[in-house]
């Protein structure tokens, strides 16, 4: 039987899950919001970033990972908060929340400024180990998602697709979305060959994602 491209990541074994649990058992704190490269905190630890359309559930996922309700705050207005937000997870990890994209109502100058900052950050941050691109399991990959994936390709940043709100779709519909996502990912050389299914509300996939992050060096 031929293996599917971009399989869904399996749940970690007990040892691997414990490594992830220990990492995220430490304190989580907001460090700063950055609007220019000069404001970046010291590149002194492993870093992962989270990208996704507005309302994809990015803040909820970060809060679920850290177990800290309200750590990352959502904005319902695309383009409203044009900052790269840094959070510490213990002494060894930065979680980086990139601004939600989807700019139908955002001024062009705001979009251009954010795109410039994002390109500089992705191409110039040596401690960035992986980007997680969040895709709503109800909708699949949209054109704006494909654009961020292209940017990650050109920046040579490995990215992994995380399907959010997986509990909101039935199995048959989820399989259709997975097929569409796999086809989209196949076009991107920087795509990591595994997909993570998550539900921040129910906690599904959180241990898996914690373990993945814990094993990045």
Swiss-Prot record:
Keywords, in A-Z order: Cell cycle, Cell division, GTP-binding, Magnesium, Metal-binding, Nucleotide-binding, Septation
Domain spans labelled EngB-type G: 44-217
Pfam families per record: MMR_HSR1
GO cellular component, one term: cytosol
UniProt keyword Metal-binding, yes or no: yes
Protein's UniProt keywords contain Metal-binding: yes
Positions of GTP binding: 52-59, 79-83, 97-100, 164-167, 198-200
GO biological process: division septum assembly
Cofactor(s) this protein requires: Mg(2+)
PROSITE patterns hit by this protein: G_ENGB
Binding site for Mg(2+): 59, 81
Molecular-function annotations in GO: GTP binding; metal ion binding
Family, similarity comment: Belongs to the TRAFAC class TrmE-Era-EngA-EngB-Septin-like GTPase superfamily. EngB GTPase family.
Role noted for this protein: Necessary for normal cell division and for the maintenance of normal septation.
PANTHER family registered for this protein in UniProt: ENGB-TYPE G DOMAIN-CONTAINING PROTEIN, MSS1/TRME-RELATED GTP-BINDING PROTEIN
Name of the protein described by the UniProt record: Probable GTP-binding protein EngB
Species the sequence originates in: Ruegeria pomeroyi (strain ATCC 700808 / DSM 15171 / DSS-3)
């Amino acid at each position: 039987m031929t293996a599917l491209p971009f399989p869904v990541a399996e749940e970690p074994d007990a040892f691997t899950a414990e490594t992830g649990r220990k990492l995220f058992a430490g304190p989580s704190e907001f460090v700063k919001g950055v609007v220019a490269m000069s404001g970046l905190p010291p590149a002194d630890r492993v870093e992962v970033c989270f990208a996704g359309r507005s309302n994809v559930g990015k803040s909820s996922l970060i809060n679920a990972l850290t177990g800290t309700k309200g750590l990352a705050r959502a904005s319902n207005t695309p383009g409203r908060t044009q900052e790269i937000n840094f959070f510490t997870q213990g002494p060894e990890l930065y979680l980086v929340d990139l601004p939600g994209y989807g700019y139908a109502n955002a001024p062009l100058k705001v979009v251009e400024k954010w795109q410039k900052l994002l390109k500089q950050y992705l191409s110039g941050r040596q401690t960035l180990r992986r980007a997680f691109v969040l895709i709503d399991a109800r909708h699949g990959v949209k054109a704006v998602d494909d654009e961020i994936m292209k940017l990650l390709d050109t920046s040579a940043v490995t990215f992994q697709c995380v399907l959010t709100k997986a509990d909101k779709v039935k199995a048959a519909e989820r399989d259709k979305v997975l097929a569409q996502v796999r086809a989209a990912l196949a076009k991107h050389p920087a795509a990591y060959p595994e997909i993570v299914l998550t539900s921040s509300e129910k906690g599904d996939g959180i241990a898996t994602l914690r373990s993945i992050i814990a094993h990045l060096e």
